From Swiss-Prot:
Main location: secreted
Organism of origin: Cyriopagopus hainanus (Chinese bird spider)
Removed propeptide positions: 20-50
Superkingdom of origin: Eukaryota
Tissue expression as described in the entry: Expressed by the venom gland.
UniProt function note: Ion channel inhibitor.
Annotated protein name in UniProt: U7-theraphotoxin-Hhn1i
Domain notes: The presence of a 'disulfide through disulfide knot' structurally defines this protein as a knottin.
Amino acid sequence: MKTAIFTVVLALAVFAVLSFGWEANEKALSEEFTELIHEKEAASETEARECRYFWGECHDHMPCCDWLVCGYKWPITYNICVWNRTFPEK
């Protein structure tokens, strides 16, 4: 009887250690994934765009893409890039 109880307690201790190791590994993976996402986000923010995309705010110093034109669209109170009814050539 003592051996059975000792075996059960030992098995529970082993499962607790394995569970703790799994949680630590999962947390490290989660932190690594979060770090990778922030790294990608920072890299995309530093890239300069050549032109503003559809419905992007535009001014003289921020031109729209070729198939868009900077125009005023009610009820928006600032100029945005709107479609000029042409398609970009490939």
